Amino acid sequence: MKFLLVLVLLVSLQVSACGAAPMNESEFAEWYLSRFFDYQGDRIPMTKTKTNRNLLEEKLQEMQQFFGLEVTGQLDTSTLKIMHTSRCGVPDVQHLRAVPQRSRWMKRYLTYRIYNYTPDMKRADVDYIFQKAFQVWSDVTPLRFRKIHKGEADITILFAFGDHGDFYDFDGKGGTLAHAFYPGPGIQGDAHFDEAETWTKSFQGTNLFLVAVHELGHSLGLRHSNNPKSIMYPTYRYLHPNTFRLSADDIHSIQSLYGAPVKNPSLTNPGSPPSTVCHQSLSFDAVTTVGDKIFFFKDWFFWWRLPGSPATNITSISSMWPTIPSGIQAAYEIGGRNQLFLFKDEKYWLINNLVPEPHYPRSIHSLGFPASVKKIDAAVFDPLRQKVYFFVDKQYWRYDVRQELMDAAYPKLISTHFPGIRPKIDAVLYFKRHYYIFQGAYQLEYDPLLDRVTKTLSSTSWFGC
């Protein structure tokens, strides 16, 4: 979002900014119109007050029409209500010299960097939110985004108070929530978020995901939309992130700049995910918690959901982690460390705070498996014992997380030490002190304290099927 309050900067920069709020509603309205609708009443000589009044009325009408209000040209209650609604700092009508008509990136692969983090949320949550916000746009375009940790990125994300060095000071809690710059070098493309807001991942405070999707839309070249259903609508409104979808208006706008998604040529006819997760014969390749969510891996994609939530989301593995292969065979999370381990054939990957660690993949034999083991069928971390259980054919191994060593006297037979469980195991999930052992279209709830199966369920029961 690039727009300028100082005329000399209009030629070179395109960003949103905010000054101190005036003392009365009339002055505030003039400030709002100059800030967001290119009202330039302060440039009209004092002797031409009639011209000034006419211009102000025209700008009020323009603003009212944009927001779908009754067009009166008067500063009425509904108009003031919109003006006082929290919003994006980018202008709705920009000076013709401030921004080219169509601004876009001229490359498909873009980098982003989170320069600093808000203290309102866990770093892992912020990372995940921006990853998902970028994915919203990559899902409907050929664009691909990669996070970097140092150096200059195409898109830099910054949390800041007040004056933060770009001529567009934040105004404190409420008012403008964030601003961004249209594509280009240097500061162009960057997105700034007002640290005075209380950033959250819920309906309380200001939802970071929703604002991030909006601002990144600007970073990719989108202007504001006057369609209230569009994520590019200027004012903030809460939508549940788990059920959020881009409007047809948003998809049309972004694809007019970049086109539709390009099929991944590395996927050899992978097919489509099942039309419903409730298919009676559906099985999973791996299942694990990831933070407060549960991931269900299948072929080249995975479903994820919050326990207890009715919403189910589906994502390709490559869009989440471009360096991770499809066909994950086993997975587990060490929640206290925010570490996720993914296994395929004789290799495994470490995902730390949702970011793949460098120097991976590594060989599963470095964990202590003999050369005869060529792949892991399933894995699960037991936080009470601080042990990882690896299931391979009819046997299982136990790995000590504290010692980082495979326990002695292993492998052991699954059928002997897990009564009621017969090989082969597809996936194992630890949830609320129980193991959920997936075998084909069914799962067995296993109580490790009682050493017995306590329930038999459909594999898809997690989805309310």
Swiss-Prot record:
The signal sequence is 1-21
The Hemopexin repeats are found at 281-324, 325-371, 373-421, 422-465
Enumerate the active-site residues: E215
Give me the residues that bind Zn(2+) 2, please.
C88, H214, H218, H224
Tell me if Signal is a UniProt keyword of this record: yes
Q: Which reaction does it catalyse?
A: Hydrolysis of soluble and insoluble elastin. Specific cleavages are also produced at 14-Ala-|-Leu-15 and 16-Tyr-|-Leu-17 in the B chain of insulin
Documented EC number(s): 3.4.24.65
Instruction: Locate the residues binding Ca(2+) 3.
Output: D171, G172, G174, T176, D194, E197
Q: What class of enzyme is it?
A: hydrolase
Q: Which residues form a coiled coil?
A: none
Cite the binding residues for Ca(2+) 2: D154, G186, D190
Q: Which SMART domains match?
A: HX, ZnMc
Q: Which GO terms describe its cellular component?
A: cytoplasm; extracellular matrix; extracellular space; nucleus
- Where do the record's glycosylation annotations fall on this chain? N313
Record's PANTHER family? MACROPHAGE METALLOELASTASE (PTHR10201:SF267), MATRIX METALLOPROTEINASE (PTHR10201)
Note on domains (UniProt): The conserved cysteine present in the cysteine-switch motif binds the catalytic zinc ion, thus inhibiting the enzyme. The dissociation of the cysteine from the zinc ion upon the activation-peptide release activates the enzyme.
Name of this protein: Macrophage metalloelastase
Q: Which organism is it from?
A: Rattus norvegicus
- What gene is this protein translated from? Mmp12
